[in-house]
Each structure stands twice: as C-alpha cells, then as structure tokens.
Amino acid sequence: ASQPVSTIQRYFVILPKKAHLESGFFHSLLKVWNIARNSGTKIEFYGNEKTIKVIEKIRKKVNIDASFYIFNDWNEMKRIFEKMKENDALILFMANREMVSFLPQMQEVPKYLNDHFRYRNYLLIFPSRKTKPEHEKLARDIGNADDFVEIGNIVGKIFK
C-alpha cells in the first residue's frame, strides 16, 4: 500500500455472486466488519441481491457505517473503480476455481490491479474453503430462520 491505513476514508467492498454460500464467508466478512468498526471508516458493499440481503441482516445486529449497492456484472467493475477517490481503498472478495463463487473474470484481477492500482490500497480476500462434505455440514442458510438466529448470535457475541 502506498498510503497509511489511517488516511483511508472509504472502503469499496466487492463481492461475487454466491459469496455468502462459501463456508468461510462469515469469517472473512468479520474481518471487514472489524476494519469498519475499528477505523470508523465508511464501507460501500457491492454485490448481488442475495449477498447484499445477508449483509444487511447482519448490519441490523451490529451496526457499521455502510451503504449497499446491487452489482451483478463483474465486467462492469471498472465503473466502481471510477467512483473511487484518492483516499479510498478496495476490498475484493475472490474465489479459487473450485469455489461456488468463482467467476472467470477473477483471473483478470491481478493484471488490472497491477496496471491501475499500483499506488492505491487494496485487499484481496479469499474465504477459506472446506472439502465438500465438510462444507455441506458447516454451511448455513440465511433464509432458514434457525440458521439466521444462530448466525446473528455468533456475530453478536464476537462484537461484544
């Protein structure tokens, strides 16, 4: 990074479709939440409708200064980058080829960052993944009321 983290005024967090289905998503999201809470920095989340709804529900339990935007086309990511100012930083949720949230456009991210973000702050997050049987056992469905309550309780305990 070319500038101190304390000078960042806003983080742009871009999430791929189905990011909320990754077994390590909530753990990774916790890292972003901690950045927002500890720095007081505004966070702008960009993701598809389902993923944004999951994050909005969590925000109701543990509030941070955040805005949410529906974003479905990773080919249009440059539009988000064009909104960024000098004191903004990027947090990009990524996925490996075997992960459910993987998008082919992710293969172009390193080159794009090298060409256009060389002197800007950015963070690439790869949520941890489990083998398929373990993933199925650990996966939570935010649409399931019991799972939602459990996720909310876990997040609430973490932030106490």
What are these regions (language model features)?
Residues 76-80:
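Repeated scaffold domains used in trafficking and secretory/extracellular systems
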Residues 1-74, 85-91, 95-160:
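Intrinsically disordered or low-complexity boundary/linker segments at protein termini
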